[in-house]
Amino acid sequence: MSSDEDKCSLHVAHNDSDRSVSTDLQEEYEELLRYAVVNPNVESGVSRPSHLRGEAVPDRFPVLGSNPLRETALEVGKGSDLNISSLSKSGSPRKPPHPVMDFFGPHFLGDSSSPASISTRTDAHEIIVGDHLVSEENFQKLENVLDIWSSGLKTNILSELSKWRLNFIDWHRMEMKKEREKHAVTVKQLSSQIADLKELQKAFEISIGRKDEVISSLSRAIGKQKERIELMKSFFRWRIGHVKSRQESYEGKLADQYFERTLLKKVWKGWRSVVQRQWKDVVERACQARAEEVCVQISNDYEAKLAMLSLALENAKAEIQRMHQEKDHFEDSMKKAFMRGVCALNLEAMTIFQNKNDAGIDFTNNKKEESGPGGPGREPSAHLDTSSSTMPSAVPLQLLPSATLAAGVASATAIPSTASLTSAGATSASSGHVPISVLSAGSAATAAPEDTFAPRVVTAAQQKAGKTITARITGRCDFGSKTRINSSLAIMGVSPPMSSVVVEKHHPVTVQTIPQATAAKYPRAIHPESGFPASRSVGARPAHAQSLSNVQSIKVVD
């Protein structure tokens, strides 16, 4: 980049100098034209082609004809041209010739001095001179102008040459600087290459040293291997001889053993032929004695085991008998507790329902009318009252509304005839409290939404001994509602797991289940003021509800 810039600067300087020289020459040429006295007609015809060729000054000089000043000017032009060419060759041989030097070059002078040009010019001068002649004053002025012009040309040429010289020196300095930079770069590259080659030489020397070490180690290993091979050869030779000696000794031992075995076989055959006659009897007697001993030992063991098992059997029988006694005692106590609970519940039911029969029936009928035959199944609650006094033992059944109003009315009116079971000749006040729970599931298609399970209370008072009372009770159950058990417990305590109850008719002994005894011992509190309605809501799936009927029997035994 720097070299290109320098070249551009040099070209610009040369162009400026050429422009200055050409402008000076143009001005001087115009000055000469002012002092030339020529014919306008002839000069116009001669000067026009000269202007077209760019050689106006030499064409105007033949106007002077055979004037000695013209010859001197031509000689001065030739000398200056020679001086300029010699200086240009010595100063800057590489530079192209200047247009001014081309203007004053020898070829131009040669052309101007050629015979054809001289003849044409002489003809023109003869015509011009024949018409007008130039005065001395004009020649003197022309001489002065030419002197001034030659001196200016000389100074311009010398200044231009000095400029070229300085430019050449600058260009030479720049080239030297570039060459020095290139030389420095090449020297640096060569030094780096020399350093790399030195490092490579060191690496090669190290690798050669390692190779020498490897070669020496391999030679030592080969020598050791040769020694080892020689030792192995000698060892195997000795081992082969040793194995052969051992083989010979082993073969001798085998021959001796074979000889001894053949002798033993012969002796054993002779002994067997002699002893074979008696060994069977001896072995049979020994086996028989051993079998007898084993049988005696086994029989003793079995007798001991039999005695132990018989003792264990007796103990088990005694334990079973004791457990039977405990069971009987427990059953007796449970019977007594059951009877006490039945009596207590019977008395409580008698006091509650003595004066409330008509009120309870009216209450259930009113509830049935309010709910309607097609309404959702919400059962009326049982109104219990504990403030009533104890009256004769006539216990009504707690009734629930059936699927229709007629069925509810019929069941309500049938209380005195079917639900109250009394015996006329009995003076005992014992009663049987039998709640019934229907646990079987029926068809969901025939169940009504309002049908729910209703426990029934049957009271037997003053019954005769040995009399069996059979009561047909119809109940409705709803397995979907979970409040059914709570409402049944609110009335009677618990739901019994059996469908028939055996009652022994004697006062101190009662039969009842454990849950019934617990319910009798801890009865639920019933508030007569609020009526405590034991309502049961219908379950989420009323399809499980079904109307069922069971036949329950109560047997009274003396």
Swiss-Prot record:
Keyword terms of this UniProt record: Acetylation, Cell cycle, Coiled coil, Cytoplasm, Cytoskeleton, Phosphoprotein, Repeat
Q: Which domain of life is it from?
A: Eukaryota
Please outline how this chain is modified post-translation: Hyperphosphorylated during recruitment to procentrioles in G2/M phase.
Basic and acidic residues composition bias: which ranges? 1-21
Indicate where the modification Phosphothreonine is found in the sequence.
Answer: T23
- InterPro entries of this UniProt entry? POC5 (IPR033351)
Extract one GO cellular component term from the record: photoreceptor connecting cilium
- Give start and end residues of every Centrin-binding (CBR) repeat: 125-156, 214-245, 246-278
Which segments carry the region annotation Disordered? Answer: 1-25, 360-393
Primary site of residence: cytoplasm
Tell me, what is an example of a GO biological process annotation in this record? centriole elongation
Which residues get modified to Phosphoserine?
S80, S92, S547
Name where it's found. Answer: Cytoplasm, Cytoskeleton, Microtubule organizing center, Centrosome; Cytoplasm, Cytoskeleton, Microtubule organizing center, Centrosome, Centriole
Q: Which residues form a coiled coil?
A: 174-199, 299-337
Residues the record lists as N6-acetyllysine modifications? K521
Q: How does it assemble?
A: Interacts with CETN2 and CETN3. Forms a microtubule-associated complex with POC1B, CETN2 and FAM161A. Interacts with CCDC15.
The record's similarity note reads: Belongs to the POC5 family.
Quote the function comment for this protein: Essential for the assembly of the distal half of centrioles, required for centriole elongation. Acts as a negative regulator of centriole elongation.
From the Swiss-Prot or TrEMBL record, give the protein name.
Centrosomal protein POC5
